[in-house]
Amino acid sequence: MIVEEIKTKWEEIKEKWDNLKEILKPEKLEEEIKQLDDLMADPNFWNDTKKAQEISSRRNYLGEKLEEILTVDKKVNNLLDYITLLEMEEDQELYNEVEKELKEIEKEISRLELGSLLSDEMDSKNAILTVQAGSGGVEACDWTEMLLRMYTRWAEKRGYQVELVDFQPDDVAGVKSATLIIKGPYAYGYLKGEQGVHRLVRISPFDANKRRHTSFSAVSVIPEIDEDIKVEINEEDLRIDTYRASGAGGQHVNKTDSAVRITHIPTGIVVACQSERSQLQNKLKATNMLKAKLYQLELEKRKEKQKELEGEKKDITWGSQIRSYVFQPYQMVKDLRTGFETGNIEAVMDGEIDDFIESYLKWKAKGGQ
């Protein structure tokens, strides 16, 4: 890049940044932060611990978001000063530094742009993510456990808290189904596009003849709702079963019948929890998960989408897949909605799915169905 090209590139970035700032509205963030600071200064603020923690968490999140915006804004403006210096006197070292900074700023703007796409009412909530084995037998169960690890790694890398609340292992290998609660700002907004069927093609380690197998796993993602949202549940509509926990292992796996499974008879929705030590605690957590699912179902009905909570009620097979993961004869992960693909399977399975998330959110914002 020559100096003129660098300046042109900066002008493009500056225009993009100015447009994005109109969406991000840093001045509104400052207003809300001030309001929250005023609340937190009240001597009685910590009388309601739960509410105080929610406000503190919101304040920290907004503060970090505003700091990100102000930092990028400062970098964009400072860069013009360096470009002006380059125009006056060419300096290869400064030139290289400016070129590097331009690329970094572009990445930061893209990340903030992605966050601006999360504007739905429930996007800011925690996510309840369930993986369930479909067609493919033990191979599908192994694939389901691989997906469980992928989402766990993704969440951990983002600094989110991950809680495994239900785990139903297969008799041979892998997992029949498992549920995670992923806690952190906009967890649901980022993960909502992962809902659907994920297809794996590979040479199965469970096949002595080393044949290529196709297997499927379904992913369901719903937002965790606030406790103050009222969802009416009639006790007579519930079937509650208890069973012995079958966790992924470790010293804290329950040895008594403390795990709880709740079936909502009118809708057929089933939730389960085994992460707590007592049956009562598991029942409370399972009930909250059921409320979240019923609330989501009601939202879907209001939008007149002819779907059930877990997405369209198709078989977990070919027709309903959203993403294909091919391990052999070549390596490719491809999103069938957006067309985004990558050959770096190892990175994807280690939780590097941000590019898929970003492409989905942009596709959806443009009216993708």
Swiss-Prot record:
Organism taxonomic ancestry: Bacteria, Pseudomonadati, Aquificota, Aquificia, Aquificales
Location of this chain's protein in the cell: Cytoplasm
Signal peptide coordinates: none
Purpose: Peptide chain release factor 2 directs the termination of translation in response to the peptide chain termination codons UGA and UAA.
Domain of life assignment: Bacteria
An example Gene Ontology molecular-function term: translation release factor activity, codon specific
Record's comment on post-translational modification: Methylated by PrmC. Methylation increases the termination efficiency of RF2.
InterPro entries: PCRF, Pep_chain_release_fac_I, Pep_chain_release_fac_I_sf, PrfB
Alphabetized UniProt keyword annotations: Cytoplasm, Methylation, Protein biosynthesis
The keyword NAD is annotated on this UniProt entry: no
Annotated Gene Ontology cellular component terms: cytoplasm
N5-methylglutamine PTM positions: Q251
Coiled-coil positions: none
Family note: Belongs to the prokaryotic/mitochondrial release factor family.
Name of the protein in question: Peptide chain release factor 2
